[in-house]
């Protein structure tokens, strides 16, 4: 018999989970005027960073910029709590430039809690949510339900471990690694969402009873060591190189505290030998655990097995805060038993006498394959039920925060009777990620990568505000002050681009010889500053050096103008591809098309397209396993066939 009790409280939106997804979802819904409650197992661990205390990196920084451009908070807090900032891939093109910040994990959590407590319309509750209240079919349509049938049930609230019921019109699940969480050290395990915190009970069973498919994934975190026990003076120092760069587009959030250095060490032959001799004692190689872990964040034993030709791997020693001696040993997660972990750490140069404060561990947990969601992150079976973050199979604070904002936004709009917002793949990394999640059958933790986007030159971090802030303002996520800041920046950017296109440098000007020497190309007569920037090797910093650009010009304006000018041809072509793909969405596909012989399609796409036989591109785009890259390849192939047919018919005449 179903448990029933009078409701304890009523809210418009309930968020379950206080991690990075849950916090963004709660703040977003509350700022849109909805009565919102965030439930978490531990209010003292809000927005905790249980693995690497860092924000950003390749593609991840683009996500953070996008969340900020839409009014989210992860970028502001990363700026406010940064211990160190670096620009990655600076020697490559702007499509892959990435800001990365090492953050003070305890300060980050405290500031997020303060922000939540100060947010109007938002209530915080410490409780374990174990059940979902629904009306309609309690089986979610059963095993024969199909998405075309629409929602089989509607969410009405949640139930907690101690029997309280809380009503809501929308519920967002952001449970991270806590659903059925089990942490492993060697062959020893215990129920936990992360070290020192209990796993969540009941929700997996509640989801399965509603017809949802669940599965297991794993992740892991390395040991923490005492900074005072490391011979840092023997190691390569890695200082901050980007203290003047920020994730947030809001200058009021730009805070630069005292910067701290990271340090670099490497594995040795002794490291590799110890691991090889004890592989069978780890959960994966010993067969105790078969959940799939993140491909792009492997354990040290995975690295040594998969890259057997390498005799050394780089390891980074990163501070966890200004007021703690704990050092995060990046790149050194392991499943070895605790009794071997200290010996393993002491094989690293500089760590021969180190003290291990916390052992490394792996955690496996339940997740909900995101093909059961619509692009709004609402579940297809149950109206009003949304999911975000690691529950959807992703890994990373940035991926979680972005999904949380989208889920919170759409949960609020559902309650208000407004249309759901879907982020197109070509418009943002948020859209790229969600499209991948809901359309592909993923069996390992998903991490956003620049290579996942076909439009990465357009989807840069520096222009995230240009791409998304107008939408954020339209949706009510950006306030009037931020909107005015945005408009002023765009005016300054356009003014600078026009100036660079008009102002000319004469061959007789004092700066000309130096700039000619830098580019290896002669200035004949005169040249516009824009054309000068288009030459390889010339940057706006060079123009500043010669008094041709105002050094007081905001960095975002200066770099934005430079990128727009330098890469204008590429940007135009990529935009044309996007526009063409939009136009082609209703283009019909021949019924007898032999996908198996189109070699530019991925193997999975050939199989899925053959099996489904879509009538047009719009239908093809909805098939799980058929990516936007596959659609582009198919479009190019059809155009080539069309030209060949026309050429052949012309030749026949």
Curated annotation (Swiss-Prot):
Belongs to the MnmG family. The keyword tRNA processing applies. This is tRNA uridine 5-carboxymethylaminomethyl modification enzyme MnmG. It comes from Prochlorococcus marinus (strain MIT 9313). FAD binds at residues 17-22. Homodimer. Heterotetramer of two MnmE and two MnmG subunits. GO terms for biological process: tRNA methylation; tRNA wobble uridine modification. The keyword Ubl conjugation does not apply. Its cofactor is FAD. One of its GO terms (molecular function) is flavin adenine dinucleotide binding. It comes from the Bacteria. NAD-binding protein involved in the addition of a carboxymethylaminomethyl (cmnm) group at the wobble position (U34) of certain tRNAs, forming tRNA-cmnm(5)s(2)U34. HAMAP family: MnmG_GidA. It is found in: Cytoplasm. Its main location: cytoplasm. Keywords: Cytoplasm, FAD, Flavoprotein, NAD, tRNA processing. The lineage of its organism: Bacteria, Bacillati, Cyanobacteriota, Cyanophyceae, Synechococcales. Pfam families: GIDA, GIDA_C_1st, SAM_GIDA_C. NAD(+) binds at residues 293-307. Transmembrane segments: none annotated. Coiled coil: none annotated. GO terms for cellular component: cytoplasm. InterPro entries: FAD/NAD-bd_sf (IPR036188), GIDA_C_N (IPR049312), MnmG (IPR004416), MnmG-rel (IPR002218), MnmG-rel_CS (IPR020595), MnmG_C (IPR026904), MnmG_C_subdom (IPR047001), MnmG_C_subdom_sf (IPR044920).
